[in-house]
Amino acid sequence: MALLASIYALRIAGLFLILPVFALFAGELAGHTPLLIGLALGAYGLTQALLQIPFGWLSDHYGRKPVIAGGLLLFALGSVIAATASHIGIMILGRAVQGAGAIAAAIMATVADLTREEQRAKAMAAVGMTIGGTFVLSLVVGPLLHGLIGVPGIFWLTGALAIVAIGALYRFLPTPVRVAAGRRDLRRDFGRILRNRQLLALDAGIFVLHLVMTAMFVVLPLIIVRELGLAGADHWAIYLPVMLVGFLAMVPFLVLANRRHRHRAVMAGAIAVLALAQLLLVFGQQSLYGLVIGLTLFFAAFSLLEAQLPSLVSRLAPAANKGAAIGVYSSAQFLGAFAGGTLGGLLHGVAGFDAVFWMAAGMLVLWLVLVLTLPEPQLLASHQINVGNQSPGQAARLAERLSRVPGVAEAVVVAEEGMAYLKIDARVLDKKHLEQFGSSV
């Protein structure tokens, strides 16, 4: 899982490394306005959002590795365009091409494919925490790299690392078994996902989370320069302590959610903390203490939700549509980044810094209300059975019989693989009955 986490971190770093310095750098590009700066920051998210679902579906049907490698190539190309941009329009193009390599869904689905159910929640949380860890490093390393090689140098660096990652992908990563059958159609796959209310609530949540985060960083670097007088290369001195404290503070709450099955309560608490952080940034931005406390609360809650949400999506997703479900989730995540950059830039240009934080607080309150109206998620376990060679007709009949076993909520039999993929409620599962159909994997 370390390699997948590293590739995911590289892709996320393409967004996060420039977050703390991009607003400062983009002000030097020809043709810039606050709105276009925000659009350039969020353009990465728009193409990610448009292509996550197709890439997730393709990874279900044609394999994870080719999709991941193709996405890394697009990311490298976009990095070259952004590195050589002298006009804000070219920068927007480069960021859009970077985002076209929409591999987050394929990576998360591969993690699910390569881990057993009893370890899957931990693996998903670990990859989710990689985002938080990348966030920590990016906000510290980004300003330092800005001082050493500039923002263009950061783009060159991440593009080169993407090429290295392709070689590592084929050299070291096992090829996962493809779960989805090639005969299923796109409309049916995504119809099942889009009718699931709990999955849609998680999609809405990750949209708001990344909208808020990206909008904040349209104005936050400018506030630090204006109010604290810190040059861009020195912003790491603010981010390092608050990120470390925030990251460590979230761990006990993540453990509580998983061990005590208090997912909704922990999520609601984290959202409330995010909203409080926005208010502190409105009223306390003129002082070092106000900024530090607000940012610490924000990063603690952000890291917690980034670790919690993808694990919930994987466990709630239909058995044979993990790539599709995570594709919808990832699309919402990156669409939020695009919306946040665009709205942040627009509000900054029209109404100033405070308007951005008030907008973010309002969005978070709406998310909190949504979470409080939903029941505690009913998380099912995944289970695989080796059922031997099956014709398509036999596979369909076997899936129907398996679905009637007490405790089996869903059954998908892939004839060409000789495998049955189940969603089960372990508390009521009739294990002896299930063993009659084949050996568990």
Language model regions located:
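Helix-to-loop junctions at the C-terminal end of transmembrane segments
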Residues: 52-63, 249-262, 348
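C-terminal membrane-cytosol helix-exit motif in multi-pass small-molecule transporters
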Residues: 160-178, 367-375
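Juxtamembrane intracellular "pre-TM" segments in multi-pass secondary transporters
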Residues: 173-205
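Short amphipathic helix-loop junctions that connect adjacent transmembrane helices
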Residues: 20-34, 218-233
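Helix-loop-helix hairpin linking two adjacent transmembrane segments in secondary transporters
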Residues: 127-170, 353-354
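Cytoplasmic membrane-interface "Motif A"-like loop-to-helix N-cap segments
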Residues: 61-71, 258-271
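Conserved MFS/SLC helix-loop-helix module at the cytosolic interface between two early adjacent transmembrane helices
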Residues: 50-86
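Cytoplasmic helix-loop-helix junction between adjacent transmembrane helices
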Residues: 94-131
